[in-house]
Amino acid sequence: DGVTDLYGVMWKPFDFDSTKHYPIISSVYPGPFYEYVPTQFDFIHGRNTQLAQLGFIVIAVGHRGGSPMRGKYYHTYGFGNLRDYPLADDKYAIEQLADCYPYIDATRVGIFGHSGGGFMATAAICTYPDFYKAAVSAAGNHDNYIYNKWFTETHNGATEEKKVVKDSVNGDR
């Protein structure tokens, strides 16, 4: 939005050389109750170190709609649209980093995540297929209305839409 600061962490290979060009991978989990930016070295983010050692720049960036600790506007940014709210921020962060750091190759961009991060990775490559060249979606919850009702209604709102269900025994209901 040009106003909200986004915070993140970058992992580089142990043998990092600033004269080389590295593909970048975004490690994601969209929240909306959690900012997927580590403040310590831990097991959950260990795969980011492993990917960096394979020759990638790896990032984890917070996005609008994440942590409630950054204020109501920031936290509720994604309310009503759990699919799209983190995508633009992730893409923008990668573009900004590539502009600042010439060793990042913005033509070779990947994204991966688990659960909500898997959902986000799939949505990202489907929404921006010319930008993201690869995506890994581990256990993505791709339909939040059947994933977890309390979570969806809390963070996306309740819907009263009537859906037609196909029933092979009794016909449509």
At which residue positions do the language-model features occur?
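Flexible, glycine/threonine-enriched loop-and-boundary segments that flank and lead into catalytic domains
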Residues: 2-15, 99
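Alpha/beta-hydrolase fold active-site loops
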Residues: 6, 23, 108
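Short beta-strand element of the alpha/beta-hydrolase
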Residues: 12, 19-31
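Active-site-proximal cap/loop segments of hydrolase catalytic domains
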Residues: 27, 47-50, 54, 60-173
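Serine-hydrolase catalytic-loop signature spanning alpha/beta hydrolases and amidase-signature enzymes
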Residues: 32-34, 58
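A flexible loop/linker signature enriched in serine peptidases of the S9 family
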Residues: 37-39
